[in-house]
UniProtKB/Swiss-Prot annotation:
Organism listed in the record: Schizosaccharomyces pombe (strain 972 / ATCC 24843)
Function in brief: N-acetylglutamate synthase involved in arginine biosynthesis.
One GO MF term attached to the UniProt entry: L-glutamate N-acetyltransferase activity
GO cellular component: mitochondrial matrix; mitochondrion
Extent of the transit peptide: 1-19
Keyword list, A-Z: Acyltransferase, Amino-acid biosynthesis, Mitochondrion, Transferase, Transit peptide
Pathway linked to the protein: Amino-acid biosynthesis; L-arginine biosynthesis; N(2)-acetyl-L-ornithine from L-glutamate: step 1/4
Principal EC category: transferase
Catalytic activity: L-glutamate + acetyl-CoA = N-acetyl-L-glutamate + CoA + H(+)
Protein's recorded name: Amino-acid acetyltransferase, mitochondrial
Main location: mitochondrion
Record-linked PROSITE patterns: GNAT_NAGS
Classification via InterPro entries: GlcNAc_Synth_fun, Vertebrate-like_GNAT_dom
Lineage: Eukaryota, Fungi, Dikarya, Ascomycota, Taphrinomycotina
Pfam families assigned: NAT (PF04768)
Amino acid sequence: MQKPSLSQDLIWILKSVQSRRSTKGFLQKHSSLKDGSPNKKSFAQPISSSFLNRISITKIDDVDSLSDNTLYGIGRSINSLARLGIQSVIVPTSNPIGMTSPFKYLENGTVVAKKRKLSIFEELQQQQNRVIRVSEIFSKAGVLTRPSYSSVCQLGPEGPSVENVQGIFQALSSLYTVIVPSSILMPNVIEVPIDGNEVLAGLTYSLHKPNFGFWVDRIVILDKNGGMPCSKRQTGSSHVLINLAQEFDELAKTLPPYHRKNLILVRRCLKMLPDDASALITTPEDAMLTNPVLDKNPLIHNVLTDRSIISCSLPRDRSPITKTTVLRSGVPVYTFLGPKCLTDGSVSWERLWVLINDSFKRTLDMDAYLDRLKNSLAAVIIAGDYLGTAIVTYEQPDGTTNEKVPYLDKLAVSQGAQGSAAISDVMFNVMTDLFPKELIWRSRLTNPVNKWYFERSVGSLKSSKTPWKLFWTGDSHVRNLDRVNQYMSVIDKIQPTWLN
């Protein structure tokens, strides 16, 4: 295995950047990083956030089944993340059905291990062998490794935690990648193997210390099964993005047990971290950084853009198969149907007015707008605490009597929430689920967002009468000119309600 050159890796990294906006966002987020030199601040005193060490905690499942070449490719990705200012802690595990059986709690408070095929000593020896193997192969890929051959976690009253946090912090500050076994020290000072999920949770709990300059930026799970399967996408494809605040309960009911376990683990870890932290689940093969493959690397792409490689709101029948899922704590999404919400107090229209003005940088004539909605409102979708909104109306096309077409009247995201939170994507998915047959909207010909709109539509057409461009989407693709003309009549006749 030939060691990659710096220029080769830099080319790979730059290939993952989608746009100038993505590059700018990465630089703004990571401008607080140190300039590549170890942090000389004392670990005993809180330090300024301008010296944050950003950490990725990665669990590699079933390492024994992975080839040296696969681990080498993963090591190259880890090395590239380090060059981007993300230091990693790696937890290699065995097949969860095999040797590393989890402990269990008894009602009397004691902890015992489940029935094992090997003795505890033999299992610990295998854990050490995994750490050694990963460390040696990662080193060949250019990673500066610091292997730990015994447990770094201990079991306390609140669950697993890191025993010697400063030791890991010192290694990370010196730009080492720390590799730890799936084992834990019990209260009686006996080391036993443990499910890697518990080690991942213990590391997350212990290593996120912003006041001391250490920030857990993301959780990564490399699993041969990949991300969470999605029934709405092509067979074999995963969810692209999971907004946990909105989707966890439903997914916990419907996912297969194996994926449900990962879902619960990720939510457990993200609850310990800030809202902008994220998790990524993908296959070991997709996580490899290899020269012959020209596809974008999901780990590097996610660090650079805070997004998945493909957008979750793109038409699903046109999206490629993916085995990568990005998960965020996210925001709850509330849906209000019909004009009742105009008067029943369920929606704060004053806050919506502020949100729309902030998003569009214009002032809405709220009285005129509400007057328009009272006879046409179909749905109001609100993301989080008025971070974003989508307002859909029913409009009557020319030449029809009772037919109504769902029309996206407003899609607004507050300036502070625009970008990596993917609020627009989340709301767009809710809309298309509410109105799967058809949904239309319009945009000025000069609107820079038109590329985003075009990618999510199944058709678009410029108006010959007004400065608008028509977009439409839905399960029933429009195949005749009459229907398009009806859509066009809707967007041409709606009058704007801005004060300026």
